[in-house]
């Protein structure tokens, strides 16, 4: 029970911090944190809640397939399947899914992936080589959630990572809440920088094709 309360507090603090950045507009987004490994359980944001508010109903505990562990009237997000795929296939401890203007714009500039390079902040992703290049996959935003989940699952490669969904934000996961938040901050910085650079240069650079 102590672990549940500890993880609840941790997730609540993350929600508060991301809310101050306006990364949960119009009740969008969802975040989760692992509570136990065997059996797998995790806390996830309840569907349709105003994340600028802090209430006892912010999160609910679900199992390895996203079904509530305790009797509740709360519903987990429809995208809980993305979280279950991550937790069932990795040792990740936290998953963050947010909608920002920048990450949505990026998915309209590129088709299957966005490539970013030569930025010091890439080291926050535990990539240390000089002039490092990263590739972030972009998948289509299917209304059929099982199809979205299956396409998402193909890009889960390790205990940390990120996938962009076209016009539907980014999902980032990490070894724990600190790692996941750090990675999310790094990706959002990179997106913001890239978009500003393109606006100065006058268009999509480096031979990439606009997807819009």
UniProtKB/Swiss-Prot annotation:
One annotated GO molecular function: zinc ion binding
InterPro entries for the chain: Aldolase_II/adducin_N, Aldolase_II/adducin_N_sf, MethylthioRu-1-P_deHdtase_MtnB
EC numbers: 4.2.1.109
Entry GO CC: cytoplasm
Record keyword DNA damage present: no
Catalysed conversion reaction: 5-(methylsulfanyl)-D-ribulose 1-phosphate = 5-methylsulfanyl-2,3-dioxopentyl phosphate + H2O
Biological pathway: Amino-acid biosynthesis; L-methionine biosynthesis via salvage pathway; L-methionine from S-methyl-5-thio-alpha-D-ribose 1-phosphate: step 2/6
Single Gene Ontology BP annotation: L-methionine salvage from methylthioadenosine
UniProt-annotated binding residues for Zn(2+): 97, 99
The entry's keywords: Amino-acid biosynthesis, Lyase, Metal-binding, Methionine biosynthesis, Zinc
Chain's role: Catalyzes the dehydration of methylthioribulose-1-phosphate (MTRu-1-P) into 2,3-diketo-5-methylthiopentyl-1-phosphate (DK-MTP-1-P).
Subunit: Homotetramer.
Family: Belongs to the aldolase class II family. MtnB subfamily.
Protein known as: Methylthioribulose-1-phosphate dehydratase
